[in-house]
Amino acid sequence: MWVLLAVFLLTLAYLFWPKTKHSGAKYPRSLPSLPLVGSLPFLPRRGQQHENFFKLQEKYGPIYSFRLGSKTTVMIGHHQLAREVLLKKGKEFSGRPKVATLDILSDNQKGIAFADHGAHWQLHRKLVLNAFALFKDGNLKLEKIINQEANVLCDFLATQHGQSIDLSEPLSLAVTNIISFICFNFSFKNEDPALKAIQNVNDGILEVLGKEVLLDIFPALKIFPSKAMEKMKGCVETRNELLSEILEKCQENFTSDSITNLLHILMQAKVNADNNNTGPEQDSKLLSNRHMLATIADIFGAGVETTTSVIKWIVAYLLHHPSLKKRIQDSIDQNIGFNRTPTISDRNRLVLLEATIREVLRIRPVAPMLIPHKAIIDSSIGDLTIDKGTDVVVNLWALHHNEKEWQQPDLFMPERFLDPTGTQLISPSLSYLPFGAGPRSCVGEMLARQELFLFMSRLLQRFNLEIPDDGKLPSLEGNPSLVLQIKPFKVKIEVRQAWKEAQAEGSTS
């Protein structure tokens, strides 16, 4: 027994003892590190991680490293370094690390969000982008799909006139249906039990990702039970059952003559690969049902909670700044009126609204720390050496709250995205990357930007969003997870009198 224990301890020491670095190489400054536990005892334990890592820059600078278990992670907190990682050397840093919780979520790095660099990731990312291209024009035009769901949302909110409600469920339904249409040409009904199940699954996954899971740091602990891992497995199993049922129905009715959604794109790619009607990079093995399911799940996971959260953040900030809300509504009244609905082309007319959306994405970035990247070869950042296999994290919070780039960064100031006349949108700083950049940038950026503008312009055109009668304002401190979620709050819904009068006049003319 003692011999086995000694062998076990020696193995751990070998795995977790800091490895020898390249002779003469200059590495990022590192937090202190101990055998086995790495830098864990020296990392701040309280508060929000993205803010803690930002504060560490005061001591260690805009690029520094730390060890967790056997892994070295480099933290990036300046836009020049971030752009080097994401853009200039995007391919060199396009890998994804293996993380226990994310491996379960992604079925061992399938899909696109958490997949490592390689043929599978490249193929599926390309196919997802091809799917979004389907929705540029005609009956499948993205704007039309968003407007349909915005109509349903606004019609529901009209029934809540005078009530104070949590927007989470109706918003989630609307955004889920947009994603579902892109993936399957299928929409859920409000009372559909599958919809509630999907919402519960997303909530459960985000709850686990918001916790520190020791197994992510020390994979050897997988021999011990973990409540967090069991919860993640249960959520993923439920999610896969729901999506598999839809996938199988779509496969039964699939024909190559009508390609109208993401699943059709994936299935057609498999048909082509099976018939050797494609290049060698499109291996049929990379297009199994499990691979398709993982990619579809990524689109649902990344597309629903992110957009829903940002819309709620926008509403919360408008409740805190009622004069700004009034100015945006005045702009809508003057430039759009009540006889038509806003369109994407109105962004250049409703510049204050667009500036407000951009400022919310700055001050409360949906992903305050981007999903970790991994160096797939020996590389460098600036004049510092980065060894192959090193994890690299861009702290978006640090970029968006840098006092040298943003005047009073903790203040909510949409005007910073407008020129001095307040009539033109500007890009005030390169330290602004709300959707990432480069090969690993968010594939749904165009969709998200359209959703945010169209939903908010429609809501403010039709409704006054007011503080509830109890006078309780939303907290602007987020709940950290993979997504920076706002804490639950209620908003009072009031149909605008000007909207009512315009509708009454239209019905009698």
From Swiss-Prot:
InterPro entries: Cyt_P450, Cyt_P450_CS, Cyt_P450_E_grp-I, Cyt_P450_sf. Its EC number is 1.14.14.19, 1.14.14.32. SUPFAM superfamilies: Cytochrome P450. One of its GO terms (molecular function) is steroid 17-alpha-monooxygenase activity. Pfam families: p450. The keyword Cell membrane does not apply. GO terms for biological process: glucocorticoid biosynthetic process; hormone biosynthetic process; progesterone metabolic process; steroid metabolic process. Heme binds at C442. GO terms for cellular component: endoplasmic reticulum membrane. It is an enzyme of class 1 (oxidoreductase). Disulfide bonds: none annotated. Coiled coil: none annotated. It comes from the Eukaryota. It is found in: Endoplasmic reticulum membrane; Microsome membrane. Belongs to the cytochrome P450 family. A cytochrome P450 monooxygenase involved in corticoid and androgen biosynthesis. Catalyzes 17-alpha hydroxylation of C21 steroids, which is common for both pathways. A second oxidative step, required only for androgen synthesis, involves an acyl-carbon cleavage. The 17-alpha hydroxy intermediates, as part of adrenal glucocorticoids biosynthesis pathway, are precursors of cortisol. This is Steroid 17-alpha-hydroxylase/17,20 lyase. The lineage of its organism: Eukaryota, Metazoa, Chordata, Craniata, Vertebrata.
